[in-house]
């Protein structure tokens, strides 16, 4: 005889849905900022993938788009200068890397200010508040704050993940400092990596691939 179905007890003090979204958004911002700490000018800027992904560029990109989605979409205004978005002939990917004339401090301050401005705009809105994303297709432009917070959280987590990998490629630093990685010595990590590599080679061999 199967046990009767039970309903889990309700959380005595559930978090407001908007507060939950904002808390996770703040956590991803902090994770992204943390990946740029303690690096040289070269390391914080240099591209580590074929498509040029770099840490300072990720911060510049997120700073640029979050103020668009979380401020401008809902009628907010700001005085942030983002010349890489100006004009019809703007350079592709200009928001994804920092020029030699753009200081690290300028990009970090842009990130902090865009976060503050975005949060100030969102603070006065309900999740069902409506806005318009002018750069989206006409049939999708009208949105709610709920939609955009989820979209921006997805965007932020996506790029925080990029930053995690790029930082590990730069100097081996990994994780978020909140116990998300097991405590292992360099030798243990080397042995673990070799096990993964050996398994990949064996799987390829069984599939008839040459490695």
Which residue ranges define each predicted feature?
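Acidic interhelical loop/turn segments
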Residues: 40-49, 116-150, 170-183
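C-terminal or internal capping secondary-structure element at the end of a domain, subdomain, or sheet
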Residues: 158, 163-166
């Amino acid at each position: 005889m199967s046990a009767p179905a039970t309903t889990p007890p309700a959380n005595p003090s559930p978090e407001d849905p908007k507060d939950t979204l904002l808390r996770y958004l703040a956590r991803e911002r902090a994770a992204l900022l943390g990946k740029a700490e303690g690096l040289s000018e070269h390391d914080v800027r240099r591209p580590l993938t074929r498509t040029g992904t770099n840490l300072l560029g990720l911060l510049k990109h997120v700073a640029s788009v979050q103020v668009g989605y979380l401020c401008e979409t809902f009628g907010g205004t700001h005085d942030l200068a983002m010349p890489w978005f100006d004009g019809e002939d703007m350079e592709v990917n200009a928001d994804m890397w920092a020029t030699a004339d753009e200081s690290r401090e300028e990009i970090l301050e842009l990130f902090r200010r865009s976060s503050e401005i975005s949060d100030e705009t969102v603070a006065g809105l309900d999740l069902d508040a409506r806005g318009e994303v002018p750069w989206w297709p006409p049939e999708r432009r009208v949105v709610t704050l709920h939609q955009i917070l989820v979209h921006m959280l997805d965007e932020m987590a996506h790029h925080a993940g990029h930053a995690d990998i790029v930082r590990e490629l730069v100097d081996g630093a990994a994780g978020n400092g909140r116990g998300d990685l097991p405590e292992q010595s360099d030798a243990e990590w080397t042995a673990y990596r070799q096990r993964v590599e050996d398994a990949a080679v064996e799987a390829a061999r069984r599939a008839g691939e040459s490695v």
